[in-house]
From Swiss-Prot:
Protein name per Swiss-Prot or TrEMBL: Small ribosomal subunit protein uS5
Residue ranges that the Swiss-Prot or TrEMBL entry lists as coiled coil: none
Keywords: Ribonucleoprotein, Ribosomal protein, RNA-binding, rRNA-binding
InterPro entries, alphabetized: Ribosomal_Su5_D2-typ_SF, Ribosomal_uS5, Ribosomal_uS5_bac-type, Ribosomal_uS5_C, Ribosomal_uS5_N, Ribosomal_uS5_N_CS, Ribsml_uS5_D2-typ_fold_subgr
Stored PROSITE patterns: RIBOSOMAL_S5, S5_DSRBD
Natural source organism: Helicobacter hepaticus (strain ATCC 51449 / 3B1)
Cystine pairs: none
Quaternary structure and partners: Part of the 30S ribosomal subunit. Contacts proteins S4 and S8.
Gene name tied to this protein: rpsE
Entry GO CC: small ribosomal subunit
Pfam family, one: Ribosomal_S5_C
Family label: Belongs to the universal ribosomal protein uS5 family.
Amino acid sequence: MEINREEFSEVVVNIGRVTKVVKGGRRFRFNALVVVGNKNGLVGFGLGKAKEVPDAIKKAIDDAFKNIIKVNIKGTTIAHDIEHKYNASRILLKPASEGTGVIAGGSTRPVIELAGIKDILTKSLGSNNPYNVVRATIDALARIKA
């Protein structure tokens, strides 16, 4: 599948800071969770880690382009209900009638919007760790049958 990066939008979902305490003080490192999508059925996510935030975001974008999936969209919504679990996060996706909009919160919304889905109902249950929620959402979208 040939991917033209100019067609894709990216959203930084989460930036985390980790601290390593050393003799001379604290050493900070950052990680970034990024979702990319062309709003036409292709979406992916990536995680990048670096000593500076912009470097972590750049690495995350590069990683996201390696993990792109195709989403089967039926009109403006999805074909059927789906529930998926990743670690302690559970996600429910339900098709919605036209004009409903994207009813999604937290880390689920950017994935749904960048996939190009216009009408959907979602519910996130269990852990709301951004990485797990994004991963559960993308896995669920990948399992939708046309």
